[in-house]
């Protein structure tokens, strides 16, 4: 309809490959969620005098478009690095049990385990990694924050690499919100029922700000 849309929550890269000229976002898309984990695995190999291609990767992903977008980007990176993809599993639809994948992980001993299953998948992964005493040098996943894995499973989650769109401790500032800590404090003051602020709220605030700035810049 030719009406600009500033969206705050949809991160799937497929939203931005359909030619939607009026769709804009304030958040990182799925292709930017977990590449840092593979780069870290490559750096770890190089630090001990081995090539990045020596890294062995295990992945387990939910079958939804969001997770499949993330997987597609990682598969390309794995090929570019020449790494070995030793496990490439799709998680069960109800996300309540990933012991089959973790049993393979125990047997194959990959250098990095990457998981994307939204909040429920993250919680299941953390719980079963703890229960099954899984020991992988690098474990990376999405939705750690929403699943509160560091609070609920502190032993298992120590050392997890967790993607997030926003954290209150970042020291950057702007004229609208001040620092992330300032905005975090203001949000809690306005909404005292929140003990912790969801990153979705920060994204939503940023989207409103961008919308305002765009219309002012266009004199619309």
Spans of features found by a protein language model:
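Extracytoplasmic ligand/sensor domains, especially the bilobed periplasmic-binding protein
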Residues: 1-87, 137-162
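Short, well-structured alpha-helical segments in soluble
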Residues: 43-47, 96-109
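Surface-exposed patches in mature extracellular/periplasmic domains of secreted proteins
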Residues: 48-59, 194-202, 220
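Residues that mark the start of a beta-strand
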Residues: 56, 111-112
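Extracellular/periplasmic bilobal clamshell ligand-binding domains
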Residues: 208-220
């Amino acid at each position: 309809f030719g009406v600009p849309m500033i969206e705050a929550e949809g991160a799937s890269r497929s939203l931005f490959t359909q030619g939607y000229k009026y769709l804009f976002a304030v958040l990182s898309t799925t292709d930017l969620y977990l590449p840092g984990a593979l780069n870290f695995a490559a750096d770890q190999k190089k630090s001990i005098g081995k090539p990045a291609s020596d890294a062995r990767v295990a992945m387990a992903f939910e079958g939804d478009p969001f997770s499949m977008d993330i997987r597609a980007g990682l598969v390309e990176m794995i090929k570019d690095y020449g790494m070995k993809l030793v496990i490439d599993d799709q998680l069960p639809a109800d996300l309540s049990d990933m012991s089959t994948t973790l049993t393979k992980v125990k047997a194959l001993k990959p250098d990095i385990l990457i998981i994307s299953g939204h909040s429920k998948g993250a919680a299941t992964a953390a719980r079963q990694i703890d229960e099954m005493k899984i020991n992988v040098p690098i474990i990376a996943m999405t939705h750690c924050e929403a699943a509160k894995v560091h609070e609920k499973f502190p032993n298992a989650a120590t050392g997890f690499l967790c993607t997030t769109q926003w954290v209150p401790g970042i020291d950057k500032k702007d004229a609208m919100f001040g620092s992330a800590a300032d905005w975090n404090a203001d949000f809690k003051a306005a909404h005292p029922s929140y003990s912790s602020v969801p990153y979705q709220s920060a994204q939503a605030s940023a989207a409103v700000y961008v919308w305002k700035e765009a219309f002012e810049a266009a004199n619309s």
